[in-house]
Amino acid sequence: MKHWWWKILAVVLVLGASIAALRVPLKQALVHVSPDRIAPGPVALEVTGYNTRFGKDEQAWLENDGQKVCAASVIVVNEHLVRMTVDVPAGLRSNMTDVCVGRSRLNGALYTEGLGSGIAEEHECGIGGKYVDFSFTFPNRNILYETIRNLCFHVPMWFSMMVLFGISLVASIRALGSTDLRHDMAADLSVRVGLLFCVMGLITGSLWARATWGAWWTNDVKLNGAAVSALIYLAYLVLRGSVPEPSKRARLAAIYNIFAFVLLVLFIWILPRLNAVDSLHPGNGGNPAFGSYDLDNSLRVVFYPACLGWILIGVWMYTLRLRLARLQSQLDDANPS
């Protein structure tokens, strides 16, 4: 049983994180405001919410650089739609104005015209209406919305792949310093399992791109780097199949594998983070990484166990394949043809 604890932990973490990632609701949020520009004078706005429960006495207002402008009238069409009219004063200080309805806010929802040094008279707008307080919710972010759940599936695939390719790198280095072909076997099998996670990462990434960016594949440096890395490791398998002599194959494959890992780090971790390179991925090409804004504490509670669980699953798959390969090798040695 002492050798099974981490395998049981892997299953529990993956199942628990997967169920939580799919079942935990998103926070209530404002997701759309129409129109998206305002100028001094009366303006009618239509505000759409998600997971909201707007009540008949709902309060609404605009906020610009800390100054509030209360809505003249608020009509609650339903729990997720509010129509409000606002007499926009001249002299707002910032180009972007937030829209607030009850306890929900959409930052930078309105482009503001007619800027000045600030409004002379400011009113305090009360907060009313029915409030749904989910005890455990995921952040509700523009563009991502429900697809933010995929973070707990997509990113763990890449972490698992990196760990497995790292195991392969260590095995290849050991293979160069030894004549023991078991190191070469370990490098080969860890690459094969790592490629499985690479493919799953590409699939989940493509699905996510379709839902958020509107295309199955975009000319994104990280997407292209991941695809090139997959081809590099597929070429590793082709190289192994083209060299029949075991010891020569082990040395050539080990040298190739070391360079492959260097290129993997370059394409996935270094190039996308250069400011001169445009990338849609968070944390790349000047885009902000998942931090306190996107990856809040509730999402971390699910995200980190998911990463650890999938890494352990990947290592488990690798050890199973390695044991089977060693048993097959022993049988072949005992029964030479």
Predicted regions and their residues:
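Membrane-interface helix-loop-helix modules in multi-pass inner-membrane proteins
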Residues: 195-241
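Immunoglobulin-like IPT/TIG beta-sandwich domains and homologous Ig-like subdomains
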Residues: 33-109
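N-terminal membrane topogenic signal
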Residues: 1-11
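Early transmembrane hairpin module of multi-pass membrane proteins
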Residues: 133-173, 177-183
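Hydrophobic alpha-helical membrane-insertion segments
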Residues: 13-21, 255-271
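Membrane-interface transmembrane-helix boundary segments in multi-pass integral membrane proteins
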Residues: 273-315, 333-337
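Beta-strand/beta-sandwich contexts
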Residues: 16-57, 111-134
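Hydrophobic cores of alpha-helical transmembrane segments in multi-pass inner/ER membrane proteins
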Residues: 158-171, 228-240, 301-319
